[in-house]
Curated annotation (Swiss-Prot):
Residue span of region Important for the catalytic mechanism of both phosphorylation and dephosphorylation: 201-210
Entry note about domains: The Walker A ATP-binding motif also binds Pi and PPi.
Species assigned in the record: Oceanobacillus iheyensis (strain DSM 14371 / CIP 107618 / JCM 11309 / KCTC 3954 / HTE831)
Lineage: Bacteria, Bacillati, Bacillota, Bacilli, Bacillales
GO molecular function ontology, one term from the record: protein serine/threonine/tyrosine kinase activity
Entry protein name: Putative HPr kinase/phosphorylase 2
EC number of this enzyme: 2.7.11.-, 2.7.4.-
Pfam families: Hpr_kinase_C, Hpr_kinase_N
Binding residue positions for Mg(2+): S160
GO biological process: regulation of carbohydrate metabolic process
């Protein structure tokens, strides 16, 4: 199971540490945050104690209104579950009683100036990406016409050279050689780099190329949702490819099915143009249009007239 430390949240969101400063190595394993409103009134049946606990104005105002004895009971009941950390939003103060309990139980108490809803959305987004299951695959990841494409193929087939051609046509590189795939949901795969290969494209006979330095910041994109899987293969004379085939092929990545096509390479073929055509065709299919079905309907209609 993937995890991050509370300290990484502190650094990412510039959080103020109010208590538990020596325990920021506590681990976070869940990608969603939680506001413990029901728990403060004593309902713990579905308390997700493994999540980061967010205390907004509603929670803090409720605690302020309680008498000291009742407040100690309510806070103690929640803190005793030992969540990874508590984060107070909207720069709220008057938190002496929270500091006392968090210090005693060695739980970091943090604070941000941001509003609750906006802050939770940012933290959820960050944790989802950090804690998502991931694999590394050999290939190139590009954003073509706003569509994330994973390009695969044997070593030396020309993936990086193709990526360079696509860059020249105004598209964006995400990762070359090693592509990190993250499963964000049951139907979403995110493609990104591994930090080491960020912005770099390896071209045979040329060497490493920093695409941002060479072509500007618009040549690079940090991540993209993978919508198409394209395999480059060597030309096979006797292979059969039916342009009128209706059935879409898929490739599985961590339980997510991604539409997949194969492009056979041959001298003189405009492979970059075929990639653009595949991206455009995928977009039309998402709008409910199939060129193959449209063509066959026309044939049937004309045959019926005859």
């Amino acid at each position: 199971m993937k995890s991050i430390q509370v300290q990484q949240l502190v650094e990412e969101f510039n959080l103020e540490v109010l208590a538990g400063e020596d325990h920021r190595e506590r681990t976070i394993t869940k990608s969603r945050t939680h506001r413990p409103g029901l728990e403060f009134i004593g309902y713990f049946d579905f308390f997700p104690m493994e999540r980061v606990q967010i205390l907004g104005k509603k929670e803090i105002n409720y605690l302020h209104q309680l008498n000291e004895q009742e407040r100690d009971i309510r806070i103690g009941n929640v803190v005793n579950y030992h969540p990874p950390c508590f984060i107070v939003t909207s720069d709220q103060d008057g938190l002496t009683y929270l500091k006392k309990y968090c210090h005693a139980e060695q739980i970091p108490l943090l604070r941000t100036k941001e509003a609750t809803v906006d802050f939770m959305a940012k933290v959820d987004h960050y944790l989802t990406r950090k804690l998502a299951p991931e694999i590394a695959v050999h290939g190139v990841c590009m954003n073509v016409l706003g569509i994330g494409i994973l390009i695969r193929g044997e070593s030396g087939v020309g993936k990086s050279e193709l990526a360079h051609t696509l860059l020249g046509r105004g598209h964006r590189l995400v990762a070359d050689d090693i592509v990190v795939l993250k499963r964000l949901s049951h139907k979403t795969i995110l493609g990104t780099h591994n930090d080491k290969n960020k912005e770099f494209l390896a071209l045979r006979s040329v060497g490493l190329l920093n695409v941002v330095r060479a072509y500007g910041s618009r040549a690079f994109q940090d991540e993209t949702r993978i919508s198409l899987d394209i395999k480059l293969s060597k030309w096979e004379k006797d292979s059969l490819h039916n342009e009128l085939e209706f059935e879409t092929q898929y490739r599985d990545y961590m339980g997510v099915s991604v539409p997949s096509i194969e492009i056979q390479l041959q001298p003189g073929r405009d492979v970059a143009g075929l990639i653009e055509a595949a991206a455009n065709n995928w977009y039309l299919q998402q709008q409910g249009y199939s060129a193959a079905e449209d063509f066959m309907n026309r044939i049937e209609w004309q045959d019926g007239d005859d």
